[in-house]
Design a protein with these regions (language model features):
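A short acidic, glycine-rich active-site loop
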Residues: 51-62
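Charged docking surfaces used in two-component/phosphorelay signaling
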Residues: 83-91
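Glycine-rich, Arg-bearing micro-motifs that act as flexible, cationic patches
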Residues: 103-128, 139, 143-147
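Glycine-rich phosphate-binding loop signature in dinucleotide/nucleotide-binding domains
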Residues: 95-101
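General small-molecule cofactor/ligand-binding pocket signal
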Residues: 34-36, 80-84, 135
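Small/aliphatic-rich secondary-structure junction motif
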Residues: 2-49, 53, 152
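Short helix-capping segments at alpha-helix termini
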Residues: 70-76
Length: 152
């Protein structure tokens, strides 16, 4: 796995869960990870305006936070960051292609089918468009185990 693992970071829990899973795999395999925050301020407005700058700042904050956490837990993993001014799915696929990544890791935040259809789902789009394998990781909250019912 010379190209490593590209990870989609969107500022939410599912991207962080994907990053943790990717770091754990990267540590086992001896490959780097690339945290990717793709953003498009507005397809209707001018590029480089205040909205786009604010979204990029959110991306910097999110990737910095998860990078710090990952580096502390997996110091052997090389972690890189790319902020890409493209739609998130396009950004992930482009970075994976440019870096010859072996896989893309994305989170699944539990959007229902209707919300995903209305809002769009980066995970869905990457899974269906990427020529590379895609690892889909549930949000950290999704893998909590419910406590066993109390005995009567």
């Amino acid at each position: 796995m010379s190209g490593g693992i590209v990870v989609g970071i969107g500022g939410g829990g599912s991207g962080f869960a994907a990053a943790r899973t990717a770091a754990r795999l990267a540590s086992s395999l001896g490959v780097p990870i690339v945290l990717v925050f793709g953003y498009e301020a507005s397809p209707l407005g001018p590029r480089g305006g205040p909205l786009e700058e604010r979204i990029a700042a959110i991306g910097e904050e999110a990737t910095s936070q998860i990078r710090t956490e990952l580096a502390a837990q997996w110091p052997d993993v090389r972690i890189e960051v790319e902020l890409v001014g493209q739609r998130p799915a396009d950004a992930l696929i482009a970075v994976a292609e440019a870096r010859s990544a072996e896989t893309i890791a994305v989170g699944h935040g539990g959007l229902g089918p209707l919300r995903a259809a209305l809002l769009g789902s980066v995970t869905y789009e990457v899974v269906h468009r990427s020529p590379r394998p895609v690892l889909v990781v549930p949000d950290d909250d999704d893998d909590e185990v419910a406590p066993a019912p109390a005995s009567a």
